[in-house]
């Protein structure tokens, strides 16, 4: 989607040769969506595109919401900012508070709405991060984010083992997000699905900018205060946010506080930037998943075992980073040093997990550009080194045991019973990459090569003096190439293709959760590897109409699959599937028609096992669970000074919940709406009133694949009315 969060109006002129409505949109039929209501809306959008393509010069329009395509630039390629048309893979940039004015900045689900190929599931569970999946990668995540590399302002949030926790990230200061869709191994290493980079709001060019935001509904309240300013070469921003409430379900109370500090100094040769994030969550209850019957009738109910065992989470996390950038006439270089720590106390139904984590990392890159025989060339290279040190202790969860006979693991009435695991887990990852690009006229050829090595080691303190030693180690490595080509069919339209590879290791948690319950590393679990073929087209196909279309085929070997063991209390274990095959396509369309912004995204996937056996059961040909075969979204925003009105639709198809394809989550369609004032006179007050899930549908917001006790579904929230008020002054940027 081509949008801009800039507050100043900009007049633009798109160079477009063909103003006719695309034939494939005019002939929109049932196959293009697969549902009557979304079908009508998608065809309505196609009709609006036809209108948008026939209206006069775009330069005569208010383009605060749509910038020229050449100006839509991303840095997710690990280079200086590039036009999306130069990239031989799917990439999206979302500017916050642009076409979708009035969002609350409360969750990634809301922020990344309408990005094709990207599924963000809000679990409505305060102990769980949203599930973020790109082209199905990441859908297996039991907690946190897997399979997708996540960064903020170039600082990795993903740990050395590939796991990402984003509960500590305050989105109040985020101004935009960039998504790289597809195999990211050649650029970032341990990531199968792609990359998400969050970009902070720019500092004011001068002056002082204080802001306060209040957001509330019946079960949650969010208070945020921020202040930003600049003086000469120095810029700064500080944001503090407090969240609290009872949650949309039984036993889902939460309370958290986050602080983010950001300071930058710009000199004649480059910049120096320091960032600090601190997060504390002393209360977060875990309501767990529900059965199909509960999803239909009482989706707000909590798992009785979670309530009995007082399942929840207490966490504190700090991240500190320092980044230096330097530029010269034909190149640039940057280096980032970061460190962090995370303290976790996590009672679950099957155990109590205590974790003390320390992390350290360095990322560097250098880029050089030049001309040779009328060819523009660009070379870049870099290195990433990360370390992760986890002191893990597991205890029996004895909550609810007071009225029962004493057990060996629960000799007292305290919640924390005897210790079952005490081990030191270390992960060290190192990667080197090089990227080359040659451009002549309308053709750009890109090649990338990366080598990675990830070393895991575990020291079992409980077996320190055991025969055979107490230290286990494993090392996983990969070389991941990528080759792509991009062709400018018109100045504002590009066709591209690529072949790429990916590599994804198990996390320390996935390796440590051994089905036999013993300490150490699961030596049977292998890294997941894949190869992607992709082709697509992106750009302006008619005046004001931006289209991003991609088709892809992904062959994966040793895919990591989660499962549960009966009577294990919901603990997640992992195994490898022999081979899986992913085929799919994704489409996004956005346009502006008079005072209205319109947009839609559609993702169609077919993911199957090709070689997968569990015991004597052959699962070849079965659908990979947890991945919706069809999902779509639409939005429309109407503006009339000083206000706006937005309506949104989201759709998810019926989705398998287990490897055998016996249990399914039903399909669903949700509607949201909001109305607000963009700026009330000179006071800077921006009130918004909205309704989520207008028709109060019962649906599965997330699927717990291969769960036991029939608890496959984490329900979404019912109808919720909310109020948001932002008071602030906007300075020049």
Predicted regions and their residues:
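Membrane-embedded beta-barrel scaffold of Gram-negative outer-membrane proteins
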Residues: 229, 323-327, 332-345, 488, ...
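Surface-exposed extracellular loop regions of Gram-negative outer-membrane beta-barrel proteins
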Residues: 284, 289-295, 387-410, 455-464, ...
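Short acidic/polar hinge/loop motifs at secondary-structure boundaries
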Residues: 148, 155-181
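Gram-negative outer-membrane beta-barrel transporters
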Residues: 366-368, 373-374, 439, 445, ...
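Conserved C-terminal beta-signal and adjacent last beta-strands/turns
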Residues: 226-228, 379, 497, 601, ...
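N-terminal periplasmic "start-of-domain" segments of outer-membrane beta-barrel proteins
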Residues: 71-103, 109, 129-133, 148
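Short strand-turn segments of transmembrane beta-barrel domains in outer membranes
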Residues: 176, 183-185, 194-229, 240, ...
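Transmembrane beta-barrel wall of Gram-negative outer-membrane proteins
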Residues: 215-244, 249-286, 311-328, 360, ...
């Amino acid at each position: 989607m081509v949008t801009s969060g800039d507050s100043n109006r900009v007049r633009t002129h798109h160079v477009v040769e063909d103003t006719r409505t695309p034939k494939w949109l005019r002939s929109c039929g049932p196959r293009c969506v697969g549902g009557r209501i979304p079908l009508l809306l998608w065809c309505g959008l196609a009709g609006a595109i036809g209108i948008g393509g026939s209206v006069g010069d775009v330069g005569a329009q208010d383009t605060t919401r749509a910038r020229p395509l050449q100006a839509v630039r991303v840095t997710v390629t690990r280079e200086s900012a590039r036009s999306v048309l130069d990239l031989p893979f799917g990439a999206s940039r979302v500017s916050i508070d642009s076409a979708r004015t009035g969002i609350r900045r409360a969750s990634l689900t809301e922020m990344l709405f309408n990005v094709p190929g990207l599924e963000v599931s809000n679990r409505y569970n305060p102990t769980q991060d949203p599930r973020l999946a790109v082209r199905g990668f990441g859908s297996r995540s039991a907690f946190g984010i897997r399979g997708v590399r996540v960064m903020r302002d170039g600082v990795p949030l993903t740990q050395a083992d590939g796991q990402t926790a984003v509960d500590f990230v305050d989105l109040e200061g985020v101004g935009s997000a960039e998504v790289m869709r597809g195999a990211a191994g050649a650029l970032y290493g341990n990531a199968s699905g792609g990359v998400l980079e969050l970009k902070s709001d720019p500092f004011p060019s001068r002056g002082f900018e204080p802001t306060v935001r209040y957001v509330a509904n019946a079960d949650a309240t969010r208070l945020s205060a921020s202040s930003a300013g600049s003086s000469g070469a120095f810029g700064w921003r500080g944001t503090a946010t407090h969240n609290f409430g009872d949650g949309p379900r039984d036993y889902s109370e939460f309370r958290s506080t986050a602080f983010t500090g950001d300071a930058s100094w710009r000199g004649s040769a480059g910049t120096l930037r320091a960032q600090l994030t601190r997060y504390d969550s002393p209360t977060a209850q875990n309501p767990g998943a529900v059965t199909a019957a509960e999803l239909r009738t009482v989706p707000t109910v909590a798992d009785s075992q979670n309530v009995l065992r007082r399942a929840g989470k207490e966490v504190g996390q700090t991240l500190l980073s320092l980044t230096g950038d330097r530029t010269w006439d034909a190149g640039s270089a940057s280096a980032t040093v970061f460190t962090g720590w995370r303290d976790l106390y996590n009672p679950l139904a099957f155990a109590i997990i205590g974790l003390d984590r320390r992390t350290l990392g360095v990322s560097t890159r250098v880029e050089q550009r030049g001309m040779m025989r009328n060819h523009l060339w660009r070379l870049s290279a870099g290195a990433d080194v990360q370390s992760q040190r986890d002191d893990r202790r597991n205890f029996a969860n004895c909550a609810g045991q007071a009225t029962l006979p004493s057990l060996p693991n629960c000799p007292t009435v305290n919640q924390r019973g005897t210790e079952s695991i005490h081990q030191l887990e270390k992960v060290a990852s190192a990667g080197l990459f090089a990227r080359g690009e040659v451009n002549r006229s309308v053709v750009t050829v890109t090649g990338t090569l990366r080598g990675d090595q990830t070393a895991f080691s575990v020291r079992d303190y409980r077996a320190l003096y055991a025969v055979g030693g107490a230290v286990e180690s494993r090392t996983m490595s990969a070389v991941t190439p990528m080759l792509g080509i991009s062709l400018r069919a018109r100045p504002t339209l590009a066709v591209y293709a690529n072949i790429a590879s990916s590599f994804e290791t198990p996390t320390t948690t996935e390796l440590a959760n051994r089905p036999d319950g013993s300490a150490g590393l699961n030596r049977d679990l292998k890294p997941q590897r894949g190869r992607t073929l992709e082709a697509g087209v992106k750009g302006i196909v008619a005046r004001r109409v931006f289209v991003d279309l991609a088709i892809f085929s992904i062959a994966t070997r040793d895919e990591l699959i989660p499962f549960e063991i009966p009577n294990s209390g919901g603990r997640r274990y992992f195994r490898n599937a022999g081979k899986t095959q992913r085929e799919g396509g994704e489409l996004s369309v956005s346009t502006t028609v008079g005072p209205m912004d319109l947009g839609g995204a559609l993702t169609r996937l077919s993911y199957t096992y090709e070689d997968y056996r569990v015991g004597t059961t052959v699962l070849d040909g079965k659908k990979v669970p947890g991945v919706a075969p069809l999902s779509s979204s639409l939005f429309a925003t109407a503006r009339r000074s000083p206000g706006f009105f937005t309506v949104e639709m989201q759709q998810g198809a019926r989705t398998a919940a287990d490897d055998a394809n016996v249990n399914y989550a039903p399909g669903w369609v949700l509607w949201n709406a909001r109305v607000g004032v963009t700026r009330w006179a000179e006071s800077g007050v921006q009130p918004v009133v909205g309704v989520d899930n207008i028709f109060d549908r019962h649906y599965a917001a997330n699927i717990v694949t291969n769960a036991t006790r029939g608890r496959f579904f984490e329900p979404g929230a019912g109808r919720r009315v909310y109020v948001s008020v932002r008071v602030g002054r906007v300075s020049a940027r």
